Amino acid sequence: MARIAGVNIPTNKRVEIALRYIHGIGPAKAKEICEQVSILPERRVSELTDAEVLQIREVIDRDHQVEGDLRREVAVNIKRLMDLGNYRGLRHRRGLPVRGQRTHTNARTRKGPAKPIAGKKK
């Protein structure tokens, strides 16, 4: 099992798919990384040589922000919005949808489970 950016990459999957197990790498970036290293995306991770795995690791470390660094940057950006006290920061602080979605009904994922209202009957 190859280890890239602190993540164990599954060996039985294609390189293009296996790279997506790394937080911050999606379909487009995975394809781009394969092109930079000149590896066919259809090859299996188990078929890669140690040198190719090392090349992939170097490209990711050099050109892409992934895993802990990416998570940390997102958290810092959200904290900055909350400290500024602007509208988006307030929505984050209150645990409500940030991007303009309706909250009269729905928004349960962001707001959590519905709180029962005393005395209300159907």
From Swiss-Prot:
Region called Disordered, residue ranges: 92-122
Keyword tRNA-binding found: yes
Any GO molecular function: tRNA binding
InterPro entries: Rbsml_uS13_C, Ribosomal_uS13, Ribosomal_uS13-like_H2TH, Ribosomal_uS13_bac-type, Ribosomal_uS13_CS
UniProt KW keywords: Ribonucleoprotein, Ribosomal protein, RNA-binding, rRNA-binding, tRNA-binding
Annotated signal sequence range: none
Family per record: Belongs to the universal ribosomal protein uS13 family.
UniProt xrefs under PANTHER family: 30S RIBOSOMAL PROTEIN S13/40S RIBOSOMAL PROTEIN S18, SMALL RIBOSOMAL SUBUNIT PROTEIN US13M
Name of this chain's protein: Small ribosomal subunit protein uS13
Protein source organism: Maricaulis maris (strain MCS10) (Caulobacter maris)
Taxon lineage: Bacteria, Pseudomonadati, Pseudomonadota, Alphaproteobacteria, Maricaulales
Recorded name of the encoding gene: rpsM
